[in-house]
Each structure stands twice: as structure tokens, then as C-alpha cells.
Amino acid sequence: GSGLVGSEMCIRDSGSGVYISIGMGKDVLAKVDGQKTYTMDAAVLMSDARSQYEEMFTSSIWSQQIDGKTFEEYVKDQIRVKLIRVRCMNAMAKEKGIVLGREEKDGVKKAAEKYYNALTEEQRSRYNITEDKLNQMFTEFAIAQKLYNDQTSLMDIEISADDSRVINIQYIVTDSKDEIEKAYAELKEGNSFFAIAKKYNSDGEYEYELRRGEMDSKFEEAAYALSTGEMSSIVEAEGKYYIIRCTSDNDKAKTEVNKSAILADKKLAAFNEKFEEYEAGKYVEWNDSEWEKLSVSSAVIYNVKFEDTFNTITIN
């Protein structure tokens, strides 16, 4: 999963090639090289987004502010950018002759059928959802994924063992320097780390599985300098005081998973950077009046998820 379909696919919007267009018909949202993206496509992605975010954060999430806009505006914008991205990726795939093989087409057909059959008649008629159009949508996302795999498989991205290393630590944390010095003295007297952590840590938590980039750099440097069984001296980071003990300086299984995740992120970033140039050169017609009518917070939640259904397709 490169995160192409997933909500975590963050893409910057260069926006330079998007032209507001009228007279595109009420079911059409976008056009690139004569190929259409339908209102249905947006409704399908909005259903996923609404159910996912409301399950995690309840419906109060939509009015929260993020980067100067509401979370709803932010998510809606991400969906717009994603639809345009998939549309343009299909244009590039066409130029490169990337098509689906027979097994992939079968997978798409089954996915579209499954999705269509989970909808009520009323849901189908509202955005003119047909099995053919769903088949096209699954096909286009699959082709985009295939193009992505194709373009990123040749990338030579190095990740050092140390960058991906996941370590297990225990820590003692206090708000004042006096307190941490007391704790340090008690450790030196031979008290167990666990007992002292329980005594000083206000929330009772004292263990953490650490990856690079998660904590303040001073904390990270001190933690990553330790070998298994070693303890740090007093570390000051972001206004708090810590003593860190390393229980494992390399959780091998977690490190492997982390390395894959870092690699996927770097590939996505490299792909986006390269692809944005191509996309900026494309003439994208966008149906703003149709888009204005759609809302994520009041999207119909279908009894089926596009992302889950899409993930049943094996893409070579």
C-alpha cells in the first residue's frame, strides 16, 4: 500500500493547470485529455472519509481548524487534489502504454460488483452510480497504482540502518531540575528504574518504543546514544527533565517494518515531486458549481468502503 488510495496520501496542490469550466454536465467533475471524473467518484471518496474520520474523532472534527481552514475544507481539498492526481496519472499511463492485465481486470470487475451490490437503489440514483462507472473508477485507481509502482520501482533510495532503528526505552520525567536530580540520586543508591519512574512520572507511563523524528532532538540524541541496558545522565528537552534507560537498542522486527515505512514515504515524496511538473503542464477542466454542492460532513455513508474494496485487487 503506497498510500495512493488511503487518506494519508498527502499531496501538495500546485494548482497551476486547473481551469474552472462551465457546461460540463451535472455528473462530471473534471476533464483531462477528454477523460472524465464523475461526481460519483467524489461521493465515493467522501463516504470513506466521513465514516473514517467520524469513527476516529466523532462528527465534531469537521469544524476544528487546521492551517487556517476547517478540517472539513481541508479534507475536501485533499479529495479534490487526489481526484485530479488520479486523472492526470491515467493520462501519463496512457502515454506510457500502462494497462491492466487480465487478472487485474478480473479483480477490478469483482471489486466494482461488490461495491455496487452494497448500495441501495436510492444511493445509486442520487449520484448516478452505475456498475460501469464504478468499474471505470476502480480501473483508474488501479492504473494509477500500477503507474506509481512502475515509476518508483526504479528509484534508488538509500536508508541507513541507524535512521530506521527502532529502540525500546524507559524514562523518568519531571518538570523541575530539583526533582530529576533527586530521582538521579535515588537511582545511584541502587533503587530500581521502574520504582523511581513510578514515583516521579505523573501519568504513570514510563516505557516507549522510539523512532527517529518523534521526539525533541536532544531527547532523541541521548536515547539513540545508549546501548541495551545503559542509562543516560539528566537530559533537558522542551522544558522537561528526563533520565532515559535503553532496554533494547534495536528491536529488529520493528526496525524492518519502520524501514519499509520510511522507504514508502520517501518514494511517495520523490514521485510527487516528479509528477507535479507533469501535472502542472496538463489542462484540467474543473466543474466548480458541481463541486460546491458536495460536502464531506453530510456525505452519504455507504455500507461499503472504497479503500477496503480496492485493496482486494492484486496489482502486479
Language-model features and meaning:
Residues K96-E104, A195-A197, S233-V235:
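Surface-exposed patches in mature extracellular/periplasmic domains of secreted proteins
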Residues T70-R87, V99-D106, K133-A142, T174-D178, ...:
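Soluble non-cytosolic domains of exported or imported proteins
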Residues S21-I129:
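N-terminal targeting/tethering segments
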Residues S7-E8, G15-G25, V32, Q123-D175, ...:
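PPIase-associated folding chaperone regions across multiple families
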Residues T37-D41, A185, I244:
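Short amphipathic beta-strand/extended segments with alternating polar/hydrophobic composition
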Residues K182-E220, K252-K254:
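Peptidyl-prolyl cis-trans isomerase
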Residues G1-G6, C10-I11:
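Single conserved hydrophobic/aromatic residue that forms the stacking wall/gate
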